[in-house]
Amino acid sequence: MEILIVIFVILSLIGSISFLKPSKKMKALSVIRHIASKEGFKIGSTQILRKKFKSWTPQVAIYQIKNDSSFKDMHFVREGNALILYAPMSLKYDEQFPVVQEKILLLPNSVLEIIFFQSNIAIVWNEMQGHEELLKIKTAILNICN
């Protein structure tokens, strides 16, 4: 009987320790998030920000980066292969809109949604695309800001 108790305790400890080891997916996400923070991205969001996005689900992530552009208060949502202006609709009649739209279309397909705020740019994208995709996104965003 004592041997069974000892075996049970040892198996419980082994099981508990195995849960502490991160999975391959979690290791990959930690590498991507580390690179993102080095590149100037803020990862995560508030409940209020999540509600502003139309395509946010728990399977995708919200990343934010400083907005150095003159573009403020714009919201684009992916429909098919293109990012479509969601708000404000009055921007479509602005003479600068074709230039903005051309730059927005250069964003990779992994970007599901992008919102330009006064101080930052928030994007929804699938983190599992890898850090190379993140660097493409950053390059495209910097191209938009210039």
Task: Place the predicted regions along the sequence by residue.
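Short extracytoplasmic
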Residues: F41-Q59
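Structured extramembrane domains adjacent to transmembrane segments
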Residues: F53-E133
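N-terminal signal-anchor transmembrane alpha helix of single-pass membrane proteins
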Residues: M1-K38
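A generic alpha-helix structural signal
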Residues: R33, Q101-I104, K138-I141
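Extracytoplasmic/periplasmic C-terminal soluble domains
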Residues: E133-N146
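Secondary-structure boundary elements
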Residues: K38-K42, N146
